[in-house]
């Protein structure tokens, strides 16, 4: 599939503290956060003018699902626009709290674990063709996804009985199955619940829930871009070496606990391979595939260059080569500098604080944004495009139809209901348009519905 629909869903951790002590329960904070949303949307589950969905997920986690995007750079921009929307809700919630005489700071963290050991996710969505064996797709993808954390892990200081260790991935400790239809109970690598949000005869939605949430724009680009290339190879019938893992769940933890990428994991064939070797296999196949097919877009070249350089840097133990582009490396360098300066062990509470503060989405507080201000975080988006993405949907996908419909209905103060595929006016006629093609950004039926308001 040369043109693919992508979507990202990020759940955010939330807390409110006063002088270091927890001030409100997550439920109470979430209520303040969403008060503005509920006042205009009459619900804590709404679709926005940019085509995205914003809602309160299980366990009081705000969740932002990007609109459908058909290129990876635009997807990263819309994910960042979601961060900005939530930052706006955070500032508004703090103001309301202070007006009511409740002192405290509200924090939203774009991470995947809280201090109690709970995990919440970043879910990636890739549209794939319905024909073809899904099990074959999953079999080839799983070794890639288990080792992909070397490219796009968010990094985590993990407290163990033997002391604290720095791990590549936050999510790795919380994955318990390879492929399953559950998302919370057993947490698989690939979720098989079949909800295509499109024509079910033609498409299915590959739902990957193993990845970490990313602060870095370049890490996000690499995560989705490399996965897209692997999918393209599978779809084209590229012959791949059998890298099936003997035990993917054990392997994902072993890979996460080794920042050198050299620890061997057992394959089902009885052989052993390191995460670097597995990734190198996929990377070299992808380079060859793109050369043979003449795939030469700027994004693909960017993805391949960063993919190769990341593997080279880890192999050479020269992390400075990717020190402004890969989340787990950026955070690791930040922690190591701080530890060296203050002569601290990895178990020190201040180190845990840095680990968390990296993911604070408040641009005046978060450590990732401090690095960005210092020019120590490479960017691929610009702030104007991100600002635009808060209210303007992607113009080349179904999101445009949804966004335009919502904008017009709100301007005309009309009651409406939307989801990923339906647009409905709640009037006497109950006019509804079903939009099954996510690639379609122009539709006479929708134009008519909008014109009739």
Curated annotation (Swiss-Prot):
Organism from which the protein derives: Streptomyces avermitilis (strain ATCC 31267 / DSM 46492 / JCM 5070 / NBRC 14893 / NCIMB 12804 / NRRL 8165 / MA-4680)
Enzyme type, top EC level: ligase
GO molecular function: ATP binding; ligase activity, forming carbon-nitrogen bonds; magnesium ion binding; ubiquitin-like protein transferase activity
Gene: pafA
GO BP: modification-dependent protein catabolic process; proteasomal protein catabolic process; protein pupylation
Stored Pfam families: Pup_ligase (PF03136)
Protein's recorded name: Pup--protein ligase
Residues that, per the record, bind ATP: 53, 66, 420
InterPro entries recorded: Pup_ligase, Pup_ligase/deamidase
Function summary: Catalyzes the covalent attachment of the prokaryotic ubiquitin-like protein modifier Pup to the proteasomal substrate proteins, thereby targeting them for proteasomal degradation. This tagging system is termed pupylation. The ligation reaction involves the side-chain carboxylate of the C-terminal glutamate of Pup and the side-chain amino group of a substrate lysine.
